[in-house]
Amino acid sequence: LLSEVPADVDDDFFLEEEVTPRMFSFNSHVGACPRCDGLGELPGYHGETKCPDCGGERLKPGGRAVKISGLNISQFCRLNVCEARAELELWRLTRNERVIAEQPLREILTRLEFLESVGLDYLTLDQRSTTLSGGEAQRIRLASQIGSGLVGVMYVLDEPTIGLHPRDTDRLIRTLKRLRDLGNTIIVVEHDLEVIRQADHLLDVGPGAGHYGGMVVASGSPKQVEHKGSSITGKYLSGKKGIQIPEERRPVNSQRTIRVQGASQHNLKEVDVEFPLGVLTVVTGVSGSGKSSLVVDTLLRAAERRVSGKRVEVGTHREITGLEYVSQLMVIDHEPIGKTPRSNPATYSKVLDPIREVFAMMPESKARGFTKRRFSFNAAEGRCATCDGQGYHLIEMHFLSDVWIPCDACKGKRYNRETLAVTYRGQTIADVLGLEISQALELFEAQPRIRRILQTLQDVGLGYMKLGQAGHTFSGGEAQRIKLASELAKRSRGGTLYVLDEPTTGLHVDDVARLLKVLNRLVDEGSTVVVIEHNPEVIKTADWLVDLGPEGGVGGGRLLFSGTPEACAHCPDSHTGQFLAPLFGMAPGTVLSVPDSGAA
């Protein structure tokens, strides 16, 4: 578009050079600034610095000189989606210019409108892809397809609602239906009940996880699936099963809170907010409203600096008080528990330690002089010398994904022949690592220490998982639940602050119910749990709610409400409240006729 619309240029460059689209691309040698190769920044000892030649605009002088309505392409791309759409609507083009620009303008506006419709209006057009969440990146790719106008295409989306507030989920559903109505096929892998209810056809796979699943238990419309007794999803759709609103919420002690004052990291606008101790607090708000800036960049970093004594950079704020009540800090995220076969549920939960002790006490071990160390696949004495106890060999494929193949010597068992001669109730240490957690629970029913740890893994819904399953094969939700179970298995000391960022990502609603039981157990043991979440099933069970917004980006960053979920349902400015209201039998936006309970 810029290469085809006339512009006022001060120098004589364009008298000699033809204006082409590549002049406005920092990915092309024709347009990219030669000093920084189109990056806009130069590497330096103290980090990256703005390129002095292009001023961070990435382009050669010719590309920067062309302007429309006073903006060159780099300046235009600094606008967020909303601002860019408004700017385009202000452009005043002549009849000839409009003929030339009509098609590209239509495509630009279509894509911008879609990005806005799925809650990405707060993103700037030049935002780096490395800073985007998986859900944001997926919706941006979908925007490029919407603008293409293709028909007869099959689109496959894996949990497109990740990171989406219920308000934006509604928008996404409308967009997917729009794609369908153009003559395309949409296949979505999804756990969100609202998306499931809007499907034309539903395939429910199960009934359980791991080898307990893998079958199609129901197929048909959502209404038809509701009546399939074998479908857990159907039971939640019909209301036969559900996550209940607690009859009574934990009381908040105003004298025991972490108080954050003047938080202004990123788009936060001098936020003053309290996080009560000893309760389950959920932080809500549409995408980009400032939740991570408040909880992760400010609260979490400040707590980390106090607890660990490390020099941690904390988000901009005036003052934070109450951290003296926090003795431990734990972040439960979706990151893998390890990247090699050495990391597994047995090692991460530390249940392998007492299991090794049991094997060391067997008569065969005592006769051979074996100690607990003999049954560690990280120790040279007992492990397979060929694979060093990994059970697998790594084959690097360079341009393809690396491949792990079983060791020819031990056949994946990790240990040498002498170590495998020792058994407990007929099982070798390798056999134990090959057991599912539910099976291991039966095997070690007479061992209290082992049983307690295994029971917590079972309680979070991981009974199907093998004790020795490699950590790099877990989904994000599985990794998170292993971390939670490991925390639960520890002797309670209280005073721990747990921070979770969207823990329901990748979880079926039945798994969400299990997750909530675990979180509530942590709180009952004296800990404080702070969760960033969009899932209404989690939000409605919170003891305390902190809602930011009202929108994302520059339109957000304000504290809209803090208090109980019921009170939030009466807050007319809160998008979260509007979706909570029906759950409490209220009309959205109903004004509460009692004194203010924390709305800001």
Give each language-model segment a name.
Residues 1-600:
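Conserved phosphate-binding elements of NTP-dependent enzyme cores
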